[in-house]
Amino acid sequence: MKTAVIDNDKIIVKNVDDIKLNGRKGAIVKVIGCGLCGSDIVKFVHKIARNGTVLGHEIVAEIFDINSAASFKKGDVIVTSHHIPCGECVYCKHGNVSMCEHFKSTNIRPGGFSEYVYLSEEHLQNVAHLKPENLTDEEASFYEPLGCIVRAVKRANLIKGDKALVVGLGSIGILTAQALRAYGCDVMGCDLLAERIELTKSFGIDACDVRELPDEYEADGIFMTSGADKAISTALKYVRNGGKIIVFSSTPSDLSAYPNNEIYYRELTVMGSYSPSPVDLNDSLALLKEGKVKVRGISTEYKLDDIQKAFDDTMSNKIMKAYIKL
């Protein structure tokens, strides 16, 4: 089978032995397509992932072989996520599922940039779902990233009618804005790139150049979906006293100045949000199926053989998001 692996400073496609169940519980699935996540790029660029690693976790796939108590059968087209919480540890009991050690240890191997992958019984029972018939394969690949966003929106715990500002209108920012709207917020998005602002508007979300936001604008919640260093200063400028800042991106390096006094005197709440629980994923799929979050036009399709170009085009901002079709 063909698979894309990290080879020093590039991603190469090579042929490897087919994978088989060999009596294991779970399923072998034939990958239809897999979205390229920002975390895949971070792992590649900063050499977090080793040579030989197969990245990719935003998977849409067809069940090829199965030995499972789950209700799926051969030929079913499914979406899945890659991490599963234990539900029993101190982190899970406090709702911090992405800090769970079991959550961190579970993954899809090889990753989704491969013709076939193995899904454990645990994956099938907890985070896999039939693909809704009204979604294309490419649209369904947003199941996992939108799950991350649903978690961030829930953690903010804003109430209906609250004002929310999304700082950074890449694919995650645009999805975040739509999810916030679906949860009843009054949403504004901002960015520096005109094409991203216009794309956001095409989804019915108010958006503007960040430099054109009125000084008097105030939001109950700020969602930092950009990793730019200036995003934190934008968040501090426009969050109301007593408001919330949701950090939903990584930065190239730690910020040099921690805004301690602003947080202290203004009673701000600053929180991070990382990865979804199975419940968040259920809600994500419902938002996609019901059309409350639309994704068509956000991603650009590439073949597996062109995966290096997909990485390069994403990193150079030629495209917003890549979808690798196998």
Protein language model regions, located:
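C-terminal hydrophobic helical "lid"/dimerization subdomain
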Residues: 3, 278-326
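A short acidic, Gly/Pro-enriched loop at the edge of an enzyme's catalytic core
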Residues: 214-222
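NAD(P)H dinucleotide-binding glycine-rich loop of Rossmann-like/cofactor-binding domains
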Residues: 86-167
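N-terminal glycine-rich cofactor-binding segment
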Residues: 5-21, 36-64, 79-80, 97-108
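Glycine-rich beta-strand-centered segment in the early N-terminal region that forms part
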Residues: 21-34, 47-90, 130-134
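Glycine-rich phosphate-binding loop and adjacent beta-alpha segment
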Residues: 229-290, 326
